Every structure is written in structure tokens, then in C-alpha cells.
Swiss-Prot record:
One of its GO terms (cellular component) is nucleoplasm. The gene is LSM10. Appears to function in the U7 snRNP complex that is involved in histone 3'-end processing. Increases U7 snRNA levels but not histone 3'-end pre-mRNA processing activity, when overexpressed. Required for cell cycle progression from G1 to S phases. Binds specifically to U7 snRNA. Binds to the downstream cleavage product (DCP) of histone pre-mRNA in a U7 snRNP dependent manner. This is U7 snRNA-associated Sm-like protein LSm10. Keywords: mRNA processing, mRNA splicing, Nucleus, Ribonucleoprotein, RNA-binding. One of its GO terms (biological process) is mRNA 3'-end processing by stem-loop binding and cleavage. One of its GO terms (molecular function) is U7 snRNA binding. InterPro entries: LSM_dom_sf, Sm, Sm_dom_euk/arc, U7_snRNA_Sm-like. Component of the heptameric ring U7 snRNP complex, or U7 Sm protein core complex, at least composed of LSM10, LSM11, SNRPB, SNRPD3, SNRPE, SNRPF, SNRPG and U7 snRNA. Formation of the U7 snRNP is an ATP-dependent process mediated by a specialized SMN complex containing at least the Sm protein core complex and additionally, the U7-specific LSM10 and LSM11 proteins. Interacts with CLNS1A and SMN. It is found in: Nucleus.
Length: 123
């Protein structure tokens, strides 16, 4: 997973099920869209706002016409449903993604590197 660069995006991801979709990167799945069309392809990227970038896509519109596309960007607002593949262990996928986020948040160990949330000096 490419970890989100902003603190806001990482916070949104770890406090929602977006983290599960981010764990599906590299897998082939189907995304149902609000306009009743369907996109089937490999998930390349999912950001904290559920924007999804798919590769090698078969796009089917609501009338059943199919188009093959190299890539497709779907805004989170247009996503109705993302099909989770049967072979995905949901619990372990979420735990792996949380570990990645916490590794980025705490990189460098204690007293090293940068702090995203430096401790406040209480007096």
C-alpha cells in the first residue's frame, strides 16, 4: 500500500473501513457505481476519500455495453459497492494496513525521527 502522505488522510483511513479497500490494492475486483454501471479491474490505488484507480478495466454501462480501458479513475462519490474477493481475510487485511499506518506514524522509534503529534509540555 502506498501510505497517504497527509495526517488527515491517514487518520480517516485508520478510523474507517477505507483501510480494507486500501488493502485490496493489486487485486482484481468489481466496483458497482451509482449510475448502475460496473467496473471490473485491478485496484491500483485507493485514497482516504474512497477515490479508486483501476487498471485493465472492463467497464459496463447501465445498458450492458462493454468497453475495455487501460485505466479508470472513480471518485468516491460515485462508488456504490466494492466487491470483496472471497479469498480475502478481512480481519488480517485490516490489521496489516493498520500496522503500515502505525509504522509510518511512529517511524524512527522513540526519540528519533519526526513526530507528527509532539507531546505537549504540561506545566
Amino acid at each position: 500500500m502506498a501510505v497517504s502522505h497527509s495526517v488527515k488522510e491517514r487518520t480517516i483511513s485508520e478510523n474507517s473501513l477505507i483501510i480494507l479497500l486500501q488493502g485490496l490494492q493489486g487485486r482484481v475486483t468489481t466496483v458497482d457505481l451509482r449510475d448502475e454501471s460496473v467496473a471490473h479491474g485491478r485496484i491500483d490505488n485507493v485514497d482516504a476519500f474512497m477515490n479508486i484507480r483501476l487498471a485493465k478495466v472492463t467497464y459496463t454501462d447501465r445498458w450492458g455495453h462493454q468497453v475495455k480501458l487501460d485505466d479508470l479513475f472513480v471518485t468516491g462519490r460515485n462508488v456504490r459497492y466494492v466487491h470483496i474477493p472471497d479469498d480475502v481475510n478481512i480481519t488480517s487485511t485490516i490489521e496489516q494496513q493498520l500496522q503500515i499506518i502505525h509504522r509510518v506514524r511512529n517511524f524512527g522509534g522513540k526519540g528519533q525521527g519526526r513526530w507528527e503529534f509532539p507531546p505537549k509540555n504540561c506545566k
